[in-house]
């Protein structure tokens, strides 16, 4: 069992560490711009760091759910690779947003594409899982004819 989910677990841990990094950046920005908790407003430089962290945190549960469902029901390696791309895009998003609101857009779109790809892999994996055995076998035969190298 452990070998079957090791890549997913690794990407999950990387994601958790990235979330911790984002939180530490907010703490650092609070100190730099003298914004004490529970305040969430201050200079624009602080607010951008704060919003970037909150936005990344809001999407993290969606990312984790789709990563694991795609990895278990579609393909672990493909889901893990897509997950790493998503996390890298979120890091670039955070860094860009901290500098200016405009610089967040390109990595935001990249992370959205990665998340939608995980959703598609998860949905396709579940669809195939719930197909009756004869339909599933026919689908796999058709795919093997279509992709003989697979």
UniProtKB/Swiss-Prot annotation:
Active site: 31, 104
Positions of post-translational Phosphoserine modification: 36
Residue stretches spanning the membrane: 7-27, 49-69, 74-94, 105-124
Annotated EC: 4.4.1.20, 2.5.1.-
Knocked-out gene: effects: Deficient mice developed normally and are fertile. However mice display abnormal inflammatory and hypersensitivity reactions.
Activity regulation: Inhibited by MK886.
Membrane topology: Multi-pass membrane protein
SUPFAM superfamilies attached to this UniProt entry: MAPEG domain-like (SSF161084)
Subcellular location: Nucleus outer membrane; Endoplasmic reticulum membrane; Nucleus membrane
One cellular-component annotation, GO: endoplasmic reticulum membrane
Known catalytic reactions: leukotriene C4 = leukotriene A4 + glutathione; (13S,14S)-epoxy-(4Z,7Z,9E,11E,16Z,19Z)-docosahexaenoate + glutathione = (13R)-S-glutathionyl-(14S)-hydroxy-(4Z,7Z,9E,11E,16Z,19Z)-docosahexaenoate
Tissue spec: Widely expressed.
UniProt topological domain (Cytoplasmic) ranges: 1-6, 70-73, 125-150
Spans within the Lumenal topological domain: 28-48, 95-104
PANTHER family for this protein: LEUKOTRIENE C4 SYNTHASE, MICROSOMAL GLUTATHIONE S-TRANSFERASE
Protein family: Belongs to the MAPEG family.
Annotated function: Catalyzes the conjugation of leukotriene A4 with reduced glutathione (GSH) to form leukotriene C4 with high specificity. Can also catalyze the transfer of a glutathionyl group from glutathione (GSH) to 13(S),14(S)-epoxy-docosahexaenoic acid to form maresin conjugate in tissue regeneration 1 (MCTR1), a bioactive lipid mediator that possess potent anti-inflammatory and proresolving actions.
Subunit and interaction comment: Homotrimer. Interacts with ALOX5AP and ALOX5.
Name by which UniProt lists this protein: Leukotriene C4 synthase
């Amino acid at each position: 069992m452990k070998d079957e989910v090791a890549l997913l677990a690794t990407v999950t841990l990387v994601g958790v560490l990235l979330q911790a990094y984002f939180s530490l950046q907010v703490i650092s920005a609070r100190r730099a711009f003298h914004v004490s908790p529970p305040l969430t407003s201050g200079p624009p430089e602080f607010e951008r760091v704060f919003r970037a962290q909150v936005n990344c945190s809001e999407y993290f549960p969606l990312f984790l759910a789709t990563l694991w469902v795609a990895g278990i029901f579609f393909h672990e390696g493909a889901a893990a690779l897509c997950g790493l791309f998503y996390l890298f895009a979120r890091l670039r998003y955070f860094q860009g947003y901290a500098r200016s609101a405009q610089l967040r857009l390109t990595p935001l779109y990249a992370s959205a594409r990665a998340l939608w790809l995980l959703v598609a892999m998860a949905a396709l994996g579940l669809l195939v899982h719930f197909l009756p055995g004869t339909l599933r076998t026919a689908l796999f035969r058709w795919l093997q004819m279509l992709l003989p190298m697979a």
